[in-house]
Amino acid sequence: MRKFLYRLDAIGNFKCLLLPVLAAVGLLHARISGQNVVLGLERAQILGEIDYTALVRWLAMMTLPLLINGFYISRCRRIELFSILRFQKRESWLEQMMLGCIFITVCYAVLLVLPLFFSHPVQVILSAWILLMLNMLLWTELLLLLNIVFPKASWTGIMCAAIICAVHVVGEQFPIISQWLPTSWGIYCRTDMVSANGASVLFCAAANLGAIEIVGAFGAAVLRYVKRRDYE
């Protein structure tokens, strides 16, 4: 574990990211507009109405790990050749990069829910953390896929953020389909534990896992294609 953390720090210089991350977590927990966005965004009382203040804070929460992972991936890309020579094969380097992104995302999700222990029951915190973590892992996997498909692109993080925003806004405009959209699967306050019309926590968790599996399978297929192309 210590060796793995040392690699993370050496590649990404994560000590310099600690302060802005903590500041962002504090801002997200501030009850601006009466909402703690860590538990998600409540449904609008009026059809099509969007609380843009809460939406911006929620998007900041969801996209921050993507930005951190994007920074980590870019640092990994800089030492790609050295890492491949060290690990003897490209798959080991990719696995190390993916594990690093997963580690960052899980730690970030834990950091988000820790302050909730002062104000919410353990069951609520665990349910919110599981949904939030799985949903963030889904978007992180999409980020990794985009970086595999477009290895030299610098806009993959921005594209992920734009996708999250677009999908959520579509769900707000058409509530009848919102529970089938991936942005809703990480929002605890829209589950049946809080909302009478919400989907179950189990459904949201299963939907996140299913989507992660689909994106992962597609990513594996892309990697196989790239490998065959390189050999040819």
What is each residue range found by the language model?
Residues 9-12, 34, 87:
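Terminal domain-start segments
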Residues 15-18, 92-96:
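Membrane-interfacial loop-to-transmembrane alpha-helix junctions, especially the N-terminal start
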Residues 30-49, 157-232:
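Terminal transmembrane helical anchor/hairpin motif
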Residues 83-91:
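Short helix-to-coil transition segments within interhelical loops
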